[in-house]
Amino acid sequence: MEKAKQVTWRLLAAGVCLLTVSSVARADSLDEQRSRYAQIKQAWDNRQMDVVEQMMPGLKDYPLYPYLEYRQITDDLMNQPAVTVTNFVRANPTLPPARTLQSRFVNELARREDWRGLLAFSPEKPGTTEAQCNYYYAKWNTGQSEEAWQGAKELWLTGKSQPNACDKLFSVWRASGKQDPLAYLERIRLAMKAGNTGLVTVLAGQMPADYQTIASAIISLANNPNTVLTFARTTGATDFTRQMAAVAFASVAWQDAENARLMIPSLAQAQQLNEDQIQELRDIVAWRLMGNDVTDEQAKWRDDAIMRSQSTSLIERRVRMALGTGDRRGLNTWLARLPMEAKEKDEWRYWQADLLLERGREAEAKEILHQLMQQRGFYPMVAAQRIGEEYELKIDKAPQNVDSALTQGPEMARVRELMYWNLDNTARSEWANLVKSKSKTEQAQLARYAFNNQWWDLSVQATIAGKLWDHLEERFPLAYNDLFKRYTSGKEIPQSYAMAIARQESAWNPKVKSPVGASGLMQIMPGTATHTVKMFSIPGYSSPGQLLDPETNINIGTSYLQYVYQQFGNNRIFSSAAYNAGPGRVRTWLGNSAGRIDAVAFVESIPFSETRGYVKNVLAYDAYYRYFMGDKPTLMSATEWGRRY
C-alpha cells in the first residue's frame, strides 16, 4: 500500500494526475484555500498521508501549492524519477526551492551512480559546490575528461575544505597525472592564508615524493608560525615560499609585534625580498603598533613605515589615531598623505574643513561643508550642525498607485501568502528574485507596495536592491510604531532612537538570526535576553525562540537599550557603540581619548570599522525617524555635541 502511494505521489508531481479531482471539493475563496493549506500541513506533520493525498488536488490554484509539491518531491527524493524533478523545476522557474532542488537532485543521481542521467538532467554546471563536484565527476565517467579536469582545477583552488563528494573527482584527477604539483602549492598557499592549518597539513602530506622536503617544512610552519625564520633560511627563495613566509609572519606579528619588527631584516635577506615585499611586512607590523602601549622607538618606526606605505586603509587608520588622541599636527600630516581619491570621502573632506576653520580660512571651510550638506548620511548632517544650519532631507517620492501588472503573477501571490503566514525569510527569498528582475522605476513601485502592505522588511529590501537611497520613507518605515511607543513609554530612550537601533540591526526582518545567535528585530543574544528579563522582571519569557516574536523582542530590546543608555549618561554615541561592541570596549576607548576630543572625532576614531559605521548609521537613522515623527532631523543633542570625549 505504501509503495502504491509513493508511485501515486511521483506521478502527481510529474504532472500526471491519477486522482479523481472531481471527488474532492475545490476551495474557491482565499480563506478556504488557507484553511485547506493549514489542514494539509497539519496532516503532513502528523504523517496522515491519506488525508494529504485526498486534499492536495483541490488546492492547485493556491499560490503556495508549489511549496507543497516541493515537500512532496523531497520527502521521497531517493525514489523520484528525473522527469518528476525536471517537470517541477521547469514549471516553477522563479521558485527559490526549485533552484536548490536542482542541485540536490544532481547529488541524488550521483548517489545512484547514474552519471549519464545526471548530465541529461543538468546539462549546465549546477549551483552548489557538492553538485559541481558530482557534475564534473560525471563528465569524467562519461569520457569528457578535459572538461572534468578544468572543473576539478577550479574547485581545487580554494583555501577552504571542500565537501566529501569532491574527493572522488580530485582522486581521479590526481591518478590521471594531469594534476600539476604546483596546484598543490597554490592550494596550500590559499589554505595557509585562510588559517586552515588542518587542510595545509593534509595537502602537504599528499604531495609527490620528490616534494617531501618542502612538504615537511610547510607542515612545521603551519603548526608553528614562529618557525618562520627557520623556514625562510632552509627553503629556497621562490614566490611560493615568500608568500608562505608572509602569511606566517602576520601570525607572529599578531602575537608579538616587536619580535616581528626585529625579524624583518633577517627575513628579507633569507628570502631575497624586494622593497615592495619588505614594505608589506612593515605594514603588517604597523597595524599592530597602533595602541597606547608602544614605546617611542616603536612609534617612530611605525610612522616611518606608514609614511612609505601605499596602503590607503593603513594611512586612514593613522589619521583616526591622530583624531583619537587630539593630535592636530598629526591629523594634518596624515590627511596630506592620503591619495586624492581617498581625500574625497565624506569623512576626510569634513576633517580638511575642520583644519581650515582652525587656521581661520572660514570661507574655504564653509564651501566644503556646504558641499557636504548636499549629500545624505552622517557627515552631511555633521556639516550642517557644525555651521549651525538646518539639514534638509532630500526625499524621493515613490508613486502612491502601483502598476497593477507588478502586483499580479505567481511570484507576488506567493509573497502575499508567505507574509500572511509570517514566513518572512522565505518571503524575502521570493521578494529578492522578484525585485532583482525589475527596472529601477518598478523597484520603487514595489518598495511602495511593500510599504503600503506593512511589509516593512521587504520595503527596505527593495530600496537596497534598487539603490533607492533617497526613498527615505520606504527605507525607514515607522515599523511596529505602536509597539515601540508602548515599550519606550516611561523609559529615557527616545522612541526614534530605539527604532533606529532596530532598523540598523535587522532592517526590520523579525525572523533574522545571526551566525552567533542574535535574534529578531533588535538582534538580542539569548544570554542578554535572560539577563535583561531578570533585571527588569519582564514576565512571560522562557526560551530564545520567543525573540523572533516582534513584541517580545521589542520589550526586551528596549529594556536592554535603556540599561546601556543609562550606563553612559544618556549619550547615544556611547550606548550605540556599547550595543554593538560591548560596554567594556567603549570605556576603554573613552579612557584612551581622555577628554581631549569632540564628538565627531570620537566617532571617527572608533577602531572597529563595523562599530564606527554602526554608530554613524544609528545617529543618522534616528534623525530620519525623528523627521518622520514630526521633529527636526538634528544629528546630535546639544549635550552630545558639546561635551568632550
Predicted segment positions?
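Bacterial N-terminal signal peptides that target proteins for export
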Residues: 2-13
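N-terminal signal peptide c-region/cleavage motif recognized by signal peptidases
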Residues: 20-25
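Generic helix N-cap/helix-start motif at coil->alpha-helix transitions
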Residues: 28-36, 48, 60-67, 79, ...
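Residue-level signature for tetratricopeptide repeat
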Residues: 42, 71, 75, 108, ...
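Structural motif corresponding to the intra-repeat A-B loop/turn of tetratricopeptide repeats
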Residues: 46, 75, 79, 108, ...
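Alpha-helical repeat scaffolds
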Residues: 51-55, 81-91, 114-124, 146-158, ...
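Catalytic glycan-binding domains that act on GlcNAc-containing polysaccharides
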Residues: 70, 269, 302, 307, ...
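Alpha-helical adaptor scaffolds
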Residues: 72-74, 86-90, 102-107, 282-293, ...
